[in-house]
């Protein structure tokens, strides 16, 4: 009876951990080889050796390649940063991709925002669907036909 009760308590604790979708620290070599799993929303720090993935990130993301399926609020530092929806904060890397809105600062060789970029993009190539801010780079693109300056070298801006 004592062994059964102990086994049930361990099973209940494991189920609680598995059901939790929030984490404070994530360590990753290559997804799915990460703790906790990619479906986790992270409120803290993620360290990626090669590739890490999570649902949402509020905090710091450091590594080689970082993928966030939904939203980022914080700082991403990686060779490649990729976000499925919105970013509020900063991205520092070689390549930064944001599929929806971005608000903050991007620094990379290539910065790409799928919707509106609000803030500052500094890179070799900068692209945004719409821009409320400043782009500084060799090539700067704004896809929105409403913008006055859609493609400019060195400096581009939109309001």
Task: Report each predicted region and the residues it spans.
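Surface-exposed, glycine- and small/polar-enriched segments that build interaction surfaces at terminal
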Residues: 20-159
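Sec-dependent N-terminal signal peptides
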Residues: 4-13
């Amino acid at each position: 009876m004592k062994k059964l009760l102990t086994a049930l308590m361990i099973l209940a604790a494991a189920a609680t951990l598995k059901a939790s979708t929030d984490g404070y620290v994530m360590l990753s070599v290559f997804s799915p080889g990460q703790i906790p799993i990619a479906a986790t929303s992270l409120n803290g720090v993620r360290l990626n050796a090669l590739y890490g993935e999570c649902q949402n990130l509020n905090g710091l993301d450091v590594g080689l390649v970082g993928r966030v399926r939904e939203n980022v609020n914080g700082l991403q530092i990686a060779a490649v940063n990729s976000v499925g929806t919105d970013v509020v904060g900063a991205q520092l890397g070689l390549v930064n991709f944001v599929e929806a809105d971005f608000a903050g600062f991007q620094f990379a060789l290539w910065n790409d925002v799928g919707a509106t970029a609000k803030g500052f993009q500094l890179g070799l190539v900068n692209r945004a669907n719409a821009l409320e801010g400043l782009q500084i780079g060799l090539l700067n693109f704004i896809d929105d036909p409403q913008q006055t300056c859609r493609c400019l070298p060195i400096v581009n801006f939109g309001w």
